[in-house]
Regions:
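Bacterial N-terminal signal peptides
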Residues: 25-35
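Bacterial N-terminal signal peptides that target proteins for export
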Residues: 14-26
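M16 family metallopeptidases and their MPP-like homologs
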Residues: 64, 69-85, 91-95, 110-157, ...
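Short, Lys/Arg-enriched N-terminal segments with co-localized hydrophobic residues
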Residues: 3-16
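A common structural junction motif
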Residues: 152-162, 257-265, 374-384, 630-636, ...
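Short, conserved secondary-structure transition motifs
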Residues: 174-181, 273-286, 393-404, 615-616, ...
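Proteolytic maturation boundary segments
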Residues: 38-60, 246-287, 294, 329, ...
Length: 962
């Protein structure tokens, strides 16, 4: 459950409106989203129908009907976040989010997670922000009554199930989340330092959503009950149901399960409390995990829906986004201080902030960076910007708006967000129009009002021992760091088999889970395919739910076509392809893309290079024309090539200190062997990237860029004939040539297990990567092994690994296992981040689970696995991304479009004996690589107790630059 899962960033601003009471019990509303592209006269019309009604206890309910797929999203949002906490109990709103998933009186042990594992849900989850907490998942529509019953149980019949032991265990889980996302990450403490200094002491935004380790540990059971009784009440909640369902039936269920939950005390909205600075503040911190000096500059901003929020959104993008932006021109191109500058306007319910973030090249003095920022601002004041600049920003907002509506869950999030913070789900229409109405004068006015010459908070986060790089007159930031000890289990707790509690009275028996509705019959999308005269294969699916088209052109090769002594060529080439064409400068190409509101990206992977495009349907042909120009008329700009190399080297430097990146890169070396091409990261190494020339890129392009190894996949509001006609120029101009895709010998799985350790001194967590090189996705056992893995580690909260290491012991925030592969063998891997002082205990428990799994896999496990995998098929083609993935499987592996039915047949017929044998064969703990990335001084020697011999320190495998 993420602390800040910004799934709602569809519209770039949200702001506060005064609360008003809805007295209408039921209202039928239609919001017509009419968005005018600022670069064209055409309009795209799209409407979202919704119905809103309010129960007598104050629960606000919103329905949105969408019958395009047999799925329904359910989102329950509470108007409470960390801003409602008090000092000394920070992190409590987020802790409570975790607790609400664990158990309720009638759902029983495992709560919604356990039910989700049976009904085919997309994974029950939640998120906490400063101002709201939400709980959500998408389910097949036959499970809607079950979800309504479950959400009501969580709201009204939960609190008695929380015991001292339950609270103690979940504290450990949340503290692990903080270690993983904050304490063990480069720049993880930056937001803490900024907020503590931007807002005055006691301000609701002066502490972090996740809180402090000390405050989390001090939370009491009475705190939990008080928080629940105050904030988790119907009159502080919004329930959204979106998807394919019967409205009248859903209303009956909602009344049945929610009506008798009592209304809580009335809740007054928080008053706006904008930040205010009398003078600038400068802080610094020596970061153990940073390899690049980072500068943040943060100014006080405005709250949600403030009239100036819209112009500030556009201002920050004009200043930092793209090659015409003054910050990019000065810091990246002129001064060569960094590869990227990020600037954004952030709005919360009662205040906001305007942030600038840049990570400079290694060894760069941040005083030079600050001077360059000021120079960029001066340039903006002198030169301003054009109407076309303004229009391209607005065009991007329009496309992003529609992209955010691709799933019923995305629509549910929007409706809930606007209902809570604007008291009107339909405010989204006005919100967009306010963005589109921003003028040049508005932008310059807010620049002068909020940025120019105004005080700010600046933070210098530098690698340890490099304080010579910090801003002058900076004071050391106060950051509390956890001390690492050799071993220990943290707070002890014992979770009973059954929790004893007093039942909450109800007018009817809630203990029986409702039955399924009519079983949905998901339709497999109709696929069309053709081969162009030049040899490129094209696969498509028509989908008219949204006025969008998404497509990709994939060329076999990528890293596999590179020389191991010169890796990184395909990655640099992919990056350079969007940096201008023969007929367009980098700035002109970027502007042409943005004026269409389109997105075009090129990226290189281990086995392919992909050109991906996304646009409004009306702009598809113009977007494709730009893709054609990018592919066939590269610019090979020497200046852009050098900038791309600098950026890549900076990325490599940062990865060298990130424990998760270290784990991934080291695991691949151990899987494939040091000299195998697939053991390398596609971005290359310091040594190889420094030596790559522009001629290397041209040679790679001239040799390997051919329609003979290309497939196109396209999904959206466009038919087959239109697509084929649009490809005529590419078919004619792109000539076929033979490209040889090499076949590599793949190493065998190890005959015995070995423990490897990569030392990251003072790491607050240990990153685990256990596994071996298994099989390709085309192997007959691949999907069967995936079925086997569901209960082991692929089923989220339903899996053994999660239940034991997270729910049972509190060792980790998350752990998973899975098979990955393509037409060549991929690994089986187990990955997690665990508290440092239980590194051995975690590894030993994983080993035990693997050893016992074949013999302990039960008929009930098999039935739950089958139920989930069969029922979850209802939602597997909901989004354009999932449809593109289907087309990729068909084109890459030669599968028929109905391969999904074959997989369903496999699920239905697999037996317990087969699963047990698959586990013995493909999840054998005695034939694996056991890699740990963490603090060797306190943890490495203990791992010899696993019984796999003395751990091998692998830092020496990676010499400087390699």
């Amino acid at each position: 459950m993420a602390v800040l899962l910004y799934l709602m960033k569809i519209i770039p601003n949200q702001s506060h409106m005064k609360s008003r009471i809805f007295s209408i019990l039921s209202s039928f509303l239609l919001v017509a989203f009419l968005v005018t592209s600022c670069s064209q006269q055409e309009q795209t019309e799209f409407s979202v129908d919704y119905e809103k009604f309010t129960l007598d206890n104050g629960l606000e309910v919103i329905f949105h009907k969408d019958d395009s797929d047999p799925v329904t999203a359910v989102a329950l949002t509470f108007h409470v976040g960390s801003a409602r906490e008090i000092e000394g109990r920070t992190g409590f709103a987020h802790l409570f989010e975790h607790l609400l998933f664990l158990e309720s009186e009638n759902l029983g042990k495992g709560g919604l997670d356990e039910m989700s594992s049976r009904i085919g849900g997309s994974g029950a989850n939640g998120s906490t922000s400063r101002d709201r907490t939400n709980y959500f998942q998408t389910v097949p529509n036959d499970a809607l009554e079950k979800m309504i019953w479950a959400e009501a149980d969580k709201l009204g019949y939960f609190i008695n199930t929380v015991t001292e032991a339950v609270l103690a265990k979940e504290k450990q889980v949340v503290k692990n989340e903080k270690r993983q996302g904050v304490d063990n990450q480069p720049y993880g403490h930056a937001s803490y330092v900024v907020d503590k200094n931007l807002y005055p002491e006691g301000h609701p935004y002066s502490w972090q959503v996740i809180g402090s380790l000390e405050d989390l540990q001090n939370a009491t059971l009475q705190d939990v009950k008080d928080f629940y009784n105050r904030w988790y009440v119907p009159n502080n909640a919004t329930l959204v149901i979106a998807g394919d369902f019967d409205s009248e039936q859903a209303k009956e269920w909602i009344h049945k399960y929610f009506d008798e939950i009592p209304r809580g005390e009335e809740i007054e909205p928080l008053a706006d409390q904008p930040a205010s600075l009398d003078e600038s503040k400068k802080l610094y911190y020596e970061d153990n995990f940073a390899r690049l000096p980072e500068l943040r500059m943060v100014w006080p901003g405005v709250d949600l829906y403030h009239e100036d929020a819209y112009a500030l959104d556009i201002l920050t993008q004009l200043l930092s986004d793209g090659k015409k932006a003054p910050l990019y021109q000065v810091l990246v191109e002129d001064e060569e201080l960094t590869s990227n500058v990020f600037m954004r306007n952030g709005n919360s319910e009662i205040a906001g902030e305007i942030s600038l973030i840049t990570r400079a090249y290694p060894g760069t003095d941040l005083n030079e960076v600050e001077s360059a920022v000021n120079e960029a601002f001066s340039r903006f004041e002198e030169e301003g910007f054009t109407d076309e600049d303004l229009n391209r920003i607005k065009a991007g907002i329009e496309t992003n708006f529609y992209n955010g509506l691709s799933s019923v869950l995305g629509k549910a999030f929007q409706l809930a967000q606007y209902n809570i913070f604007a008291n009107d789900p339909g405010y989204i229409n006005e919100d967009i129009q306010k963005t589109l109405a921003v003028t040049k004068d508005d932008v310059m006015r807010v620049y002068g009002q909020y940025i120019k010459g105004k005080p700010f908070v600046a933070t210098s986060f530098v690698p340890r021992g490099q304080t010579d790089l910090i801003l002058e007159e900076s004071n050391e930031a106060e950051v509390e760091e956890e001390q690492i000890v050799a071993e220990g289990r943290g707070e002890q707790f014992e979770l009973p088999e059954e929790t004893e509690y007093e039942s909450t009275p109800s007018s009817f028996d809630r203990s029986e889970e409702p039955p399924y509705g009519d079983t949905p019959v998901p339709a497999i999308p109709e696929v069309w395919e053709t081969e162009l005269a030049n040899g490129m294969n094209v696969f498509g699916i028509e989908s008219y739910e949204l006025p969008l088209v998404e497509f990709e052109i994939t060329l076999e090769g990528g890293l596999m076509l590179e020389d191991p002594s010169n890796v990184g060529v395909s990655n640099l080439m992919a990056d350079l392809m969007t940096k201008g064409t023969a007929n367009k400068t980098p700035e002109e190409l970027e502007e042409a893309i943005e004026l269409l509101g389109a997105n075009i990206n090129v990226y290189a992977g281990r086995q392919s290079i992909t050109i991906r495009g996304n646009s409004l349907a009306r702009n598809y042909e113009e977007t494709l024309a730009l893709v054609e120009e990018i592919m066939l008329e590269p610019r090979w700009d020497e200046r852009e090539f050098e900038l791309s190399k600098q950026s890549t080297l900076s990325q490599i430097a940062q990865q060298s200190a990130n424990p998760n990146s270290i784990a991934s890169n080291t695991f691949n070396k151990l899987l494939y062997g040091e000299d195998h091409i697939l053991s390398y990261n596609p971005i290359g190494t310091t040594n190889t990237v420094e030596n790559i020339t522009l001629e290397d890129l041209k040679d790679y392009y001239n040799t390997n860029f051919s329609p003979s190894v290309a497939d196109m996949h396209i999904v959206g509001a466009i038919d087959e004939n239109e697509v084929i006609a649009s490809l005529s120029p590419l078919e004619e101009k792109w000539e076929n040539k033979a490209v040889e895709i090499p076949e590599f010998d793949m190493p065998d799985a190890p005959e015995s297990s070995t423990v490897y350790f990569y030392d990251v001194p003072d790491a607050k967590q240990s990153v685990l990567r256990f596994g071996y090189l298994a099989m390709p996705e085309t192997h007959p056992d691949f999907y069967k092994a995936t079925i086997m893995n569901y209960k082991l580690g692929g089923g989220g909260f339903a899996s053994r690994l999660t239940q034991e290491l997270r729910e049972g012991k509190g060792y980790t925030y998350g752990i998973r296992s899975g098979f990955s592969g393509s037409d060549i063998a991929g690994p089986f891997s187990i990955s997690s981040g665990v508290r440092t002082n239980v590194t051995y205990e975690s590894a030993a428990l994983v080993k035990q689970i693997l050893e016992e799994y074949p013999e302990t896999f039960t008929d009930e496990d098999l039935n739950n696995t089958k139920s989930y995998l069969i029922k979850s098929s209802a939602r597997q083609f909901e989004t354009s991304g999932s449809k593109l993935n289907m087309l990729s499987n068909i084109s890459s592996y030669g599968w028929e479009p109905d391969y999904v039915r074959d997989r369903q047949e496999t699920v239905q017929t697999i037996t317990k004996d087969e699963v047990q044998e698959l586990a013995r064969t493909y999840a054998d703990p005695n034939r694996m690589i056991w890699l740990v990335v963490g603090d060797a001084k306190t943890q490495m020697d203990r791992l010899e107790q696993l019984g796999f011999g003395e751990p091998v320190l692998v830092n020496e495998y990676f010499k400087e630059g390699e």
